[in-house]
Amino acid sequence: GGAEATANSPVVQSLNVSTTTVLRCRTYADGSYPSEEIIRTYVFEQQPSLAAVFVTTDPLSMFSADSGLYMTGNSASMMDPKYGANFWSNRELPVYVEMFEPGSPKTPAFGVMGDFKISGQYSRAKEKKSFSVTLREEYGNKRLKYPLFPDYPELKKFKAFSLRNFGNNSGDDYVRDRIGTQMTEGLGVDYQHGRYVIVYYNGKYYGIHDLRERNSEYYYETRYGLDPNDIDLLD
């Protein structure tokens, strides 16, 4: 699943769905423009105690062995972190992102189009990778208007957000990264709010990730209402 609906896609009148499935649908008629594409994820999983994030995108663009953004590709070095691999590219992919909250498993809390980009440093070579999603006006949504972090309902407008693989600790623990961040709460310094979520790509389970505020000029828009064009970030 995940491939964009085109005029060459299979035509269906009705469809029975019994496993977790992503559907991308569009109507075509002679002499008319194609309809807007509708993307929906149908979930047949045991209700988790964590929120679930479903990422839908063209499967070849993401997972093709040769050119997929998530994959090693043909130009990577042998040693980690495999410089030259596809996942070191700055390329972005259009994705559709849905989020299901634990208490409302039947209806997504939101569904938005955005640009997907692999992030991180050495942990890019891990099987599970960190990534960011950035909303674009060209997709119809300049901002995500939803409180991503239930403990902080005042934060409800986001240009971008990150889903981390827990960095170099990925696969070893899921605690250190979050605790290290949360310990700064109350110290009067800025830090990224976060929460644990599970992630699916095109309906396939990809494990627990750390949903975070994106560390960029838009962080200050969300937190303080500042114009991101007035922010200069220095590394």
Where are the language model's segments positioned?
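Conserved ATP-binding subdomain of kinase catalytic cores across diverse folds
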Residues: 55, 76-235
